[in-house]
Amino acid sequence: MPEKRMEEFKALVKRCRTVGLVPLIDFIPNHVSRAYLADWDGHDDFGEGDDHHTFFSPEQGYFYLTSNSPGDGPPLHLPDGLFEGEMTFGRVTGNNAVTWNPTRYDWYETVKLNYGYNFLAGLPALRLLPDWTSPKQRVPKTWRIMDDILSFWQGLGIGGFRCDMAHMIPMAFWKWAISRSRVRLPDVFFMAEAYNDHMKTTPGDPC
């Protein structure tokens, strides 16, 4: 029953733990549905307070199309006619398509999340993210929200995460998030999806 889904989930986790199984769930950090809306109280949501006319700002949740972006928009033109495009603004797709006219080969039903660096700027932008060389650099908002999400599921007894499209997320985030998760649960398990021929590399990874 939909209204009992959290209770059912908790019961499943308990049964797994009782027989010595460690439950893992899917963690999708790169993108969300274009219709995504969080329903957890007391937490910031992706995109809250964003300037819909600015392509990139470190504290924004998404990347927004501008008047200089390719294509004839607004509105956003989606290729299949099944989803209504955003009418007064547009957001970059989950596969980094910066256009008002994403194709059917783009992930047009998804939206790219912003990890505090402009993915169009390359390596120089990655150097602005917080890491051991710049510990005083402000932790981007999306990082903080993702840490809250991981913490929530760990609090329910989840012991690990299968990380979707892990190579599209900055290495600096993974180091930060995994370290924080291991403070909460030292043996927490992270498994990265190996999606293409460059599965060893993430933004900022020297491999």
Annotate the PLM regions:
Residues 31, 44-47, 59-60, 64-73, ...:
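Active-site-proximal helices and loops of the catalytic beta/alpha 8
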